[in-house]
Regions:
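Short active-site neighborhood of thiol/selenol oxidoreductases, capturing the structured segment around
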Residues: 211-223
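Oxidative protein folding and maturation machinery
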Residues: 1-208
Length: 223
């Protein structure tokens, strides 16, 4: 496994950062819920130390050999260092400098997926829709295949959270920007046409007596 230079480059990060990432996960949750006091201050300090350790391991691994698939892959695991209250233009400029997301070779890895999840973690759940809009607006400027794959990934995530109103909004706003892939287009159409409270699409059926019936002309109300 460790024979190739790129595998060694990846392992240099994973081996050193695995424990630190585990600690960070625990400390983040602790800092969220623990009341003010000396212990909270100590936990925040420890969290900062562990995050710095991960970033150091990451930078060291990337610099082993710049330009390789491994280094490009690892670059999307860097911490997203900006204040979410900054203007959209500033955030987009930061992303274009640090996370270009234009490398098709990374599309079948989890690099871009990891970036999107990390981006969302900077926001409260109530702001996820706006955060995803920022990501999609950024991606829309680049490669359509990458945009479509990540749009599909975002839809899957919002579907798993049962955020159906957000799915409708995203489908309306970005559905025309995705590729002509049949499955994605069909999925987008289902979110816009069949959302809760929307009027059902009209269609014609044949009864067992051979009579054609149009849904909109049936006597019973429908939604």
């Amino acid at each position: 496994i460790l024979e190739s230079a790129e595998n060694q480059q990846l392992y240099a990060y994973v081996a050193q950062a695995e424990l630190a990432e585990y600690k960070i996960g625990i400390l983040r949750e602790l800092v969220k819920i623990y009341p003010q006091g000396e212990f909270l201050t100590a936990a925040e300090k420890e969290l900062g130390k562990e995050k710095a350790q991960v970033n150091t391991c990451l930078d060291k691994a990337i610099k082993q050999k710049n330009g390789t698939f491994a280094s490009r892959y690892l670059s999307y695991f860097r911490e997203i260092n900006f204040n979410i209250s900054e203007s959209t233009d500033k955030k987009m400029n930061f992303l274009s400098r640090n996370f270009p997301m234009n490398d098709l070779e990374l599309l079948n890895s989890n690099a871009y997926h990891h970036f999107i999840v990390s981006y969302l973690k900077k926001y409260e759940p109530s702001e996820y829709l706006n955060a995803v809009r920022e990501i999609l607006d950024y991606l829309k400027q680049g490669n359509q295949e990458i945009f479509s794959k990540m749009f599909d990934y975002v839809l899957t995530g919002f579907e798993s959270m049962e955020r159906y109103d957000d799915l409708y909004q995203l489908s309306v706003e970005y559905g025309n920007s995705c590729s002509t892939d049949g499955n994605l287009k069909t999925r987008v159409k289902s979110y816009t046409d069949l959302r809760v409270g929307a009027k059902a699409p009209d269609f014609e059926i044949e009864t067992i007596d051979g009579e054609d019936v149009v849904l909109s002309q049936m006597k019973n109300d429908y939604t």
